[in-house]
Amino acid sequence: MIANTAAYHFAVIDAPQALCDQLQARAEASGLQGTILVAGEGLNLFLAGAPSAIDGFYAELRADARFADMRVKTSFSEHQPFARLKAKVKDEIISFRRDDGQPLDYPRAPAIDPATVQRWLRQGHDDAGKPVVMLDTRNLQEIEYGTFKDALVLPIHKFTDLPEALAPHREALKDSTVVSFCTGGIRCEKAALWMLNDGMDNVLQLDGGILGYFEEVGGEGYEGRCFVFDERVALDAELKPLVDEPLPEPRPSAF
C-alpha cells in the first residue's frame, strides 16, 4: 500500500536551496518518490511511499516551527504513482507573478469549510441569500476530468493567465459570493488573495481545495474526478485513483 500526499505551507524560507537539499536527502533516505518544491515563500510537496515512511517524514518536518501547522492530504493506492524523486528551488511554490497575491505579504483571504460549501450548494445560495459562484482556478487540462456543477470555468492553460481571463466576468460576479477552488488549496489561496486586493470583496477560498472537499464531505455537487499531476491521472470522490498500475520499467540505455 502506498500513501500519496499533497501538502503546502507558506512560510519565510531564508535559505531555500539548503532546505531543498535537506528535504531531498530525507525523502531519499525514506524511500519516497514525488516532487519537492521550495521557494522563499514556502513549500509545495507531492510525495508518495510507505505509510510509515510518509508519517515519519512529515513528523520530522512539522518539528520545524515554520511548518508545525502544515496540513497534509493523504490518499492511498496499490502502486507508486511517481517514477522518481525531484527537488527544485523555485521563485514561487506556484507561479502567479502578482505582487498583490503573495500570502506572506498580506493576511490570508477568508476561507470557507467544505461542509458549509456543501450546504450552500444544496440550498442554492449562501447564508445571506446571495447566489454562490464556484470559481475554478485550474487549467482546462484539469477541468476536463471534472469540476463543481455550474462552476465558472476560465479558458486558461496556466495559472498566470487567470487575472486576464477573469476580467470579463467581474461585473457579473459583483452581487454573488465567489468561492475560488483548486486541487489542494494553494492556487485558490493565491487567487482569492489577489481578487480581494484587486477590489473584489465578495471572495472566499475553499479550504483544502477539491481534495479537502472529497475528504470531508464526499462528492456532492461535484461532477467527475479531480485531476492530479501524477500517474494516477485523477481521483474520484472517494479518493480512489483512475489509474493504479505499476509504472513501466525504465528502458535500457542505448549507450
Model region roles, listed by residue range:
Residues 119-129:
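A short acidic-Thr-Gly-centered motif at the start of a beta-strand
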Residues 112-120:
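Phosphate-interacting basic helix/loop segments used at nucleotide- and nucleic-acid interfaces
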Residues 1-110, 129-132, 138-178, 186-255:
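Rhodanese-like catalytic fold shared by cysteine-dependent sulfurtransferases
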Residues 181:
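Cofactor-cradling patches in redox/metallo enzymes
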